[in-house]
Regions:
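A conserved beta-strand-loop-helix scaffold within acyl/acetyltransferase catalytic domains
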Residues: 2-52, 56-70, 113-118, 126-263
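Short glycine-/small-residue-rich flexible loop motifs, especially phosphate/cofactor-binding loops
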Residues: 17, 98, 123, 173, ...
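N-terminal cap/recognition module
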Residues: 66-67, 71-80
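Hydrophobic faces of well-ordered beta-strands that scaffold small-molecule active sites
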Residues: 74-76, 109, 286
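A short, internal acetyl-CoA/4′-phosphopantetheine-binding micro-motif in the GNAT/acyltransferase core
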Residues: 77-87, 154-156, 255-264, 292
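A gly/proline- and charged-residue-enriched helix-loop-helix capping module
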Residues: 80-134
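Aromatic (often tryptophan-rich) hydrophobic motifs at membrane interfaces
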Residues: 91-102, 216-319
Length: 319
């Protein structure tokens, strides 16, 4: 049976959050903390329980009102959270979401669950429930990146993981340390430094960036699940990243760097420090996130893939 989460019930909120953060398919964007970041959206959540009252699945739904049209767009980022082979639970969750669509006059529901393109059983189940699989969607047309680069930790030690990197990547990490680059875990006091790097990166690489307030909200609302990493050389900021750790996964969500002093290799050291955070807390995956156009060696973004590839992970393509 499904229910709309009661936002006034502290026990229900705790129970929801505990389910999501301990589930293998949990994701920080399905956390209630994420609603404090997406402040321009309304939100609801659906909870599906078995006959004993145990939670079997959940879905956080972001709701965007469309001005002047009186309708809404509903989106569940990397949701729902459940066993994707459990048809009964999936159907129950989506029946609950249909109630939300009626309440908010929804014209479209979009979900991007953590199902890979090779999970044909799960894909067919989603199709049977009325969803369309955008198999050939062009790069950058989906809300979340379809092609990610991940490093599976697999209970390995830091030493074992380090030795698995390409030898040039190991050299660059050691070089960065020898050159005196310092990678720090920072608080909001370093956001100005990070945002200047982000502005430079966006201008250099030709993409729009989030507001500084957005990054402030991430650090504030995700709390212990979010870190700001900064690399400094002689107290000059060279690179920075906002990284999350939730449900057994550490995700490199936003990164920025200056074109100056690249010879001291700050980005290599920063990634290594974030991977160490994942290992220290028993994560199963370190997610480098998107690698758009990674199959096209002539595309300007190909260098993003080449950099991440040196850490000896694998490409994961979501459905």
């Amino acid at each position: 049976m499904n229910e709309i989460l009661n936002k006034q019930d502290d026990k229900a909120l705790w129970e929801y959050e505990n389910f999501v953060k301990t589930h293998i398919n949990g994701n920080f964007m399905q956390s209630l903390c994420w609603t404090g970041v997406k402040r321009t959206w309304e939100w609801e959540a659906i909870v599906s329980r078995d006959d004993t009252g145990k939670i079997k699945g959940t879905a956080l739904i972001l709701i965007k009102k469309i001005p002047f049209l009186g309708c809404s767009f509903l989106y569940s980022p990397h949701g729902p959270v459940c066993d994707y082979t459990d048809v009964k639970t999936l159907r129950d969750i989506f029946e609950g979401i249909e109630k939300l669509k009626e309440l908010h006059n929804g014209y479209e529901l979009r979900v991007d669950p953590c199902i890979t393109e090779n999970d044909t059983k799960e894909i067919n189940i989603m199709k049977s429930l009325g969803f369309e699989f955008q198999e050939n969607a062009p790069e950058l047309t989906t809300i979340q990146a379809r092609n990610n680069y991940i490093l599976r930790i697999n209970n390995r030690s830091k030493e074992e993981i380090f030795e698995s990197f390409h030898k040039k990547w190991r050299y660059n990490i050691r070089l960065s340390l020898r050159k005196g680059v310092e990678c720090r875990v920072c608080g909001p006091e370093c956001l100005d430094d990070f945002y200047k790097l982000m502005e430079e990166t966006g201008k250099r690489d030709g993409f729009c960036i989030r507001s500084k307030e957005y990054f402030e909200l991430m650090l504030k609302n995700l709390g212990e699940h979010c870190r700001l990493y900064m690399c400094y050389h002689d107290n000059e900021p060279l690179s920075g990243a906002i990284t999350t750790q939730y449900a057994g996964k550490t995700c490199y969500v936003y990164g920025a760097s200056t074109a100056k002093s690249r010879n001291v290799m700050p980005n290599y050291l920063m990634q290594w420090n974030m991977i160490c955070w994942a290992v220290e807390n028993g994560c199963s995956i370190y997610d480098f996130q998107g690698i758009p156009f990674y199959k096209d060696e002539n595309h300007p973004n190909y260098g993003v893939y080449r950099f991440k590839q040196g850490f000896n992970g694998e490409v994961l393509t979501y459905a």
